[in-house]
Amino acid sequence: MAAKDVKFDIDARNRMLKGVNILADAVKVTLGPKGRNVVLDKSFGAPRITKDGVSVAKEIELEDKFENMGAQMVKEVASRTNDEAGDGTTTATVLAQAIVKEGMKSVAAGMNPMDLKRGIDLATSKVVEAIKSAARPVNDSAEVAQVGTISANGESEIGQQIADAMQKVGNEGVITVEENKGLETETDVVEGMQFDRGYLSPYFVTNPDKMTTELEDAIILLHEKKLSSLQPMVPLLESVIQSGKPLLIIAEDVEGEALATLVVNKLRGGLKIAAVKAPGFGDRRKAMLQDIAILTGGQVISEDLGMKLESVTIDMLGSAKRVSITKDETTIVDGAGAKAEIEARVAQIRNQIEETTSDYDREKLQERVAKLAGGVAVIRVGGMTEVEVKERKDRVDDALNATRAAVQEGIVVGGGVALIQAAKHLDGLEGANNDQNIGINIVRKALEAPLRQIAENAGVDGSVVAGKIRESSDLAFGFNAQTEEYGDMFKFGVIDPAKVVRTALQDAASIAGLLITTEAMVADKPAKEGAGAGGGMPDMGGMGGMM
């Protein structure tokens, strides 16, 4: 086992804080409408330019192992916020840095770290309550566009595209983002269906960068039972190979020998294939398989109907223009099903919605209608160069996630103002002791950090802006960094999804609390140069006389 390097107390915390600051300082320059770009070097291809906080965070790896631990913990804040809310990663990073900085100062001054953490947790839950109660629902398409615009760093075209897409497929519909070959960004609505089952093996992945499986012009086998052996399917698989088209298997499960055989065939390149579990459970699974069959123009292979795998022919399978599979979701786009049959199926499900008395069943049936009728909207992002397209696609992804979050939990005042207004709810909050009160004050101070950073990125003194907003009794009063004006943020259209603001604070406080309470750090000692050359023969001199 390699020797370990151990750091304690102040030395450990200082090293960690340095790492936190390096990562946060690189990420926070992107915050706000006047945030700057960060250029990321790639080992192959052109450098990538981005304003996406989590993309910047993911690239950072520090040489000093102790500093790197601090950086990796804050990277975790950005990643978690991105996974939960899809946006707000830079805000979360700025909040985490502010809490850690103040917390470390207090620990160095002799405060109890555990009490500080308890104070931070108390304050965070109080502020989260305030954000939730301040949220109001999204009223119309214009507000959806405003949320998207803010998240896309002020580009109104992106906000409008997302609002249009949401209008076309509804809030239940599925929206995906792709790169366009041309200069324009356009929105297409394609008939399609998405369900929450991912690939059964990562070996099916065709795009390792995104860890997705993309099948173009695919054939789809729908099987109601488990597949544990492929022997009955051999004639069918031979027909599929002859057709040259990729195959998607949707079954209750594909396990053991069957899965191993598919993976081996995929790796050898003989068969373009992927397998996913069927969505739903019990009777609902049967119904959803039937939905997919109607959408793709195929049949469900069911033993109840006397169908055996041995007798299945290729014309009994469904087909779709494109299938995209991630580890969690499968999207079938442009199925070959007849329009009249799809409409009849939708009408049938709508009748069931009217008849059902269970709220849960009604919700699930409505989801099925959305998947059959709503389709998939595809936003194709264009640009002059590949670098520009990738940068814009990052922003469209963020904006899309933000608008979804806004529809889920409502909107609050944007530009960091919601956090400052929520801080007023901490005024009467008392901890069990003085150290906990200091923890509460750490959060109170940290809540101003995003607004200050937005102002500073716009070239304005952050403390002056924060002071003005703190003094105002109008909850919507704020600073529009785009126009450098003070006023009603709702009228300016500067709004944030409540879910994004809430998640950013919760994740930041959670990780910052862990960092503050760290007392020791352990890392591998760096290997000494030339240590790998041991065991060779010593001096070889004097062997010349052996001839």
From Swiss-Prot:
What residue spans carry the region label Disordered?
Answer: 528-547
Reported EC number(s) for this entry are 5.6.1.7
> Where does it reside?
Cytoplasm
Q: What is its main location?
A: cytoplasm
Q: Which UniProt keywords apply?
A: ATP-binding, Chaperone, Cytoplasm, Isomerase, Nucleotide-binding
Pfam families with a match to the protein in the record: Cpn60_TCP1
Q: Which GO terms describe its molecular function?
A: ATP binding; ATP-dependent protein folding chaperone; isomerase activity; unfolded protein binding
Q: Which reaction does it catalyse?
A: ATP + H2O + a folded polypeptide = ADP + phosphate + an unfolded polypeptide
Quote the biased-composition stretches of kind Gly residues, using this chain's numbering: 531-547
Q: Which GO terms describe its cellular component?
A: cytoplasm
* Alphabetical list of PANTHER family matching this protein: 60 KDA HEAT SHOCK PROTEIN, MITOCHONDRIAL
Protein function: Together with its co-chaperonin GroES, plays an essential role in assisting protein folding. The GroEL-GroES system forms a nano-cage that allows encapsulation of the non-native substrate proteins and provides a physical environment optimized to promote and accelerate protein folding.
> HAMAP family, alphabetically?
CH60
Name of the protein: Chaperonin GroEL
Q: Which gene encodes it?
A: groEL
